[in-house]
Amino acid sequence: MKTNKIVFIFGPTAVGKSDILFHFPKGVAEVISVDSIQVYKEFDIASCKPSIELRSHIRHHLVDFLEPIYEYNLGIFYKESCKIIESLREQKKIPIFVGGSAFYFKHLKYGLPSAPPVSEKVRLYINNLFIKMGKDYLLEELRRVDFKRYESINQNDIYRIKRSLEVYYQTGIPISQFLQRENMFENIVAIGLRRPMDEMKSRIISRVKNMIDCGLLDEIKSLLGKGYDEKTPAFKGIGYREFLLWRSRPCYLLNDIINLIVKNSFLYVKRQMTFFNKLPNVLWFHPDDDLKNILDLIFV
């Protein structure tokens, strides 16, 4: 077993990533969570944090790491991950990154995107273009100056649209050229987990029902009672934000909110798989049928 390897285990929400961790041998590996909501303290149920039982079987990092009022971002994740990797390598343990945030996996592999600073003059110019001409105009301009970035970007992500144009107007170089990076770590084993979509839909429905049965409503009432609200970064997670909508629209029934969580979760699964399918050199497995192959790949 090579102890200098780094393992990625990724897949969409509810695919069964945590389930396979119970089969890992104790003491030879630790998990680094790649999740933008599990990182927050107190937001437990809808984020589907690993159970106490699982965390006693294999240590998890970046779970219950941050207070809910603070923004979690790629920079924090990357910095903390590098420290954890270094520590685990000193202990001759395997770092295993587990989660569903494809954006974080991508930049852990290739490094943080680097682009030059932009002057306030250029920033104001692009923002004024957005105010006067709208998002579609900026998208068309991005298509003209950096088609590669235009094809890859979420076309509703106005922050990254503006940022891409700012870099181009500042330097005359497409931001896509700045984002091309070499692998930051050697010997990465990338394991993808997937199931048929009808199976995923059924698992999502069961998961949401289990959230309600486990006391999600009481957890949200408690969080609101502590002063957290829609401005709290942790409330952006699926399963939390829908209940904030319910609070502002009392005409909604509980079943409407449950159905909305299921719908949003399934749409998120589709977006996750679209992103994951673009990652190179991934070994894909069904988490139930291929467990032995997964274990051999990591630990043999």
Swiss-Prot record:
GO MF terms held by the record: ATP binding; tRNA dimethylallyltransferase activity
Binding site for ATP: 11-18
Swiss-Prot/TrEMBL cofactor(s): Mg(2+)
Signal peptide positions (record): none
One GO term of the biological process aspect: tRNA modification
EC number: 2.5.1.75
Keywords recorded for this protein, A-Z: ATP-binding, Magnesium, Nucleotide-binding, Transferase, tRNA processing
SUPFAM superfamilies (alphabetical): P-loop containing nucleoside triphosphate hydrolases
Assembly information from the UniProt record: Monomer.
Function of the protein: Catalyzes the transfer of a dimethylallyl group onto the adenine at position 37 in tRNAs that read codons beginning with uridine, leading to the formation of N6-(dimethylallyl)adenosine (i(6)A).
Listed name of the protein: tRNA dimethylallyltransferase
